[in-house]
Amino acid sequence: MIYIDASNHIYGRLSSYVAKKLLNGESITIVNASKVVITGRKEFIIDKFNNLRNTGSIRKGPYYPKTADRILKRSIGDMLPKKKTHGMEALKRCMVYANVPKSLENKNFERIESAMNKKVTGFITLGEISKILGETYE
């Protein structure tokens, strides 16, 4: 079981790292998903997520999530082979939390150095995006 503190990690790099580990058969728990950063200009990133949410219709998908933990889990799932059983089983081994739950406060969390946001100044967090998209709880 791997525990990852996702604060100040880059969205895509973290997702691809976790997807590879899941396909290798490991179980992963990610906390602080609301503190994951997406690099780029805020206006373009917000427009991208708004356009994703507005595609399709109410009755037919695709359905895109509003909350930070579900946005991150969907991006990890998009990197897995969903139509194969090992891809579906891999996604079941991944747990994502927006903050640190009380049951996991005493665990030792890893930080992935290859996915850290070190010098990039233009970014927005998943927590900010989810508030803009209309997340109703925290």
Swiss-Prot record:
Keywords from the named record: Ribonucleoprotein, Ribosomal protein
A GO biological-process term: negative regulation of translation
GO cellular component terms, semicolon-separated: cytosolic large ribosomal subunit
One MF annotation (Gene Ontology) recorded for this entry: structural constituent of ribosome
One protein family per Pfam: Ribosomal_L13
Subunit details: Part of the 50S ribosomal subunit.
Family, per entry: Belongs to the universal ribosomal protein uL13 family.
Function of the molecule: This protein is one of the early assembly proteins of the 50S ribosomal subunit, although it is not seen to bind rRNA by itself. It is important during the early stages of 50S assembly.
Name of this protein: Large ribosomal subunit protein uL13
Lineage: Archaea, Methanobacteriati, Thermoplasmatota, Thermoplasmata, Thermoplasmatales
Gene name as annotated: rpl13
